[in-house]
Amino acid sequence: MNETTQSVWPYTSRLQKGGALLEDMRLLVRAWSHEPAEEILERVLRSNLLNKQTRARLADVYRRAFVPRFLKGPIPDAWTLVRPLEDAEAPLRLVRPVYYWLTALAEPLLGDFCREVLFAQANGVRGETGTEHVLAWFASKGCPWSQDVSKRVARGLLAALRDFGILEGKVRKRLAHTTPPLPSLAYIAFCLRLQGANSRELVLHKDWQLFHLSPDEVERAFLHAHQDRLLEYYAAGSVIQIQFPADSLEEYARVVTR
């Protein structure tokens, strides 16, 4: 089974090629625009923007990571969601959760593992995660890869979660137990609003499980964000109202980085 069958099979082996690739993705997002992709890619290749040893390696990162995550993923042209933060010179601690969120959406293998395995760990089921746990989960999902490929994908998945700050540790990984900065959560909520989520859906959205947050924890985060004037949060019984002090991503990026 190859990567072109993703419309039928949700999981790919792409993570074996580099995991998070966070710095590479940031460089490409900063270089991207609404010009034809072929023209931008050619400039990136000529300048060796990613400082790779060969053009083939740079092109591989573009094809296997940047395209599915930030050009042709579940959110088309997702680079436009995070670019305003880069233009506002947001610090790494603020942009990293947003890149993680978009990557987990584009790589269902990563997102589902976080929801189904790590979200349970956050509630006290198990404290550590190793390659064997990932491989067992792959087997439960019927992943069709060879043992060698499965091991490489498992290592790439764990490395990605470490680089995104979800896990910590070298060999035996454990949950970092750190909540993303409020500005990051507020910015993701604003992106979800632009994708059509209403106020109640923002609190209950399944994407918060990627950060091991229950609806109650999301509500508390929104209350703190309200106090920090990142958004306005009102709740009366089952009625929830969330409003943002901006109409565009560019405006809101300035709000969360002030």
At which residue positions do the language-model features occur?
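Eukaryotic partner-binding/assembly regions in large regulatory complexes
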Residues: 1-105, 109, 113-120, 129
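Short amphipathic alpha-helical interaction segments
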Residues: 53-60, 145-163, 211-224
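Short, leucine-enriched amphipathic alpha-helices that occur as contiguous helical runs
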Residues: 110-115, 131, 154, 184-189
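Short helix-capping/hinge SLiMs at alpha-helix to coil transitions
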Residues: 122-126, 195
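Short acidic alpha-helical/loop segments enriched in Asp/Glu that coordinate divalent cations
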Residues: 126-129, 146-151, 167-179
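DNA-recognition alpha helix
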Residues: 128-144
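Beta-rich nucleic-acid/ligand-interaction surfaces
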Residues: 136, 154-157, 179-180
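Accessory, usually C-terminal, subdomains that scaffold auxiliary metal cofactors
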Residues: 168-251
